[in-house]
């Protein structure tokens, strides 16, 4: 995983060049939006349990066969595993959002995830739907539009960070579909 600073230095070093120009401007922008980024991550992690439980509940409401005796969420153990997996995915999305880099998500969470779920017989469409619900919830919390919870956030537009967060969830959906 490379943060924004390490990425710039690594790229400049590979070119045997000084850090400057567009790279410095990108870092300046990253720093100036630092408080918003921290608040965005905080809004997601502060509501992680709510986001994950809403996603799993929504997935089950749309596909009640998941909790039937032959379903993938039947028994407390399987339901707990489903919630745990949602928490892990959300945690790695929050790491990516914090660092502004998806490599931690890709390397430590998504690598081999589809194959694991396939071998366990987990339906990809239900999984993708739960991730889609988590994405909508996280974006709502970042934009401070979640109906039940309003946080104090710095003034300004957070739509860029919400869009960045959404792109990380899109990577998860693509990896498991």
Swiss-Prot record:
Where is this protein found?
Plastid, Chloroplast thylakoid membrane
Locate the residues binding (2R,3E)-phycoerythrobilin 3: 158
Residues reported to bind (2R,3E)-phycoerythrobilin 2:
82
Any idea which positions bind (2R,3E)-phycoerythrobilin 1?
Answer: 50, 61
What domain of life?
Eukaryota
Recorded topology in the membrane: Peripheral membrane protein
Q: Which CDD domains match?
A: PE_beta-like
Key word Electron transport present? yes
Listed SUPFAM superfamilies: Globin-like (SSF46458)
Query: Per the record, a Pfam family?
Result: Phycobilisome
InterPro entries, from UniProt?
Globin-like_sf, Phycobilisome_asu/bsu, Phycobilisome_asu/bsu_sf
Ordered alphabetically, the record's keywords are: Bile pigment, Chloroplast, Chromophore, Electron transport, Membrane, Methylation, Photosynthesis, Plastid, Thylakoid, Transport
Which residues are reported to carry the modification N4-methylasparagine?
72
Name one cellular component (GO) term. Answer: phycobilisome
Task: Name where it mostly resides.
Answer: plastid
Q: Which GO terms describe its biological process?
A: photosynthesis
Q: Explain the post-translational modification.
A: Contains three covalently linked bilin chromophores.
Spell out the subunit comment.
Heterotetramer of one alpha-1, one alpha-2, and two beta chains.
Q: What does this protein do?
A: Light-harvesting photosynthetic bile pigment-protein from the phycobiliprotein complex.
Cite any additional comment in the entry: The light-harvesting system in Cryptophytes contains phycobiliprotein complexes. Unusually they are composed of either phycoerythrin (CPE) or phycocyanin (CPC) but never allophycocyanin (APC), with only one type of biliprotein being present in any one species. Unlike cyanobacteria or red algae these proteins are not arranged into higher-order phycobilisome complexes, and they are found in the thylakoid lumen.
Family under the similarity heading: Belongs to the phycobiliprotein family.
What this protein is called in its record is B-phycoerythrin beta chain
Organism this protein belongs to = Guillardia theta
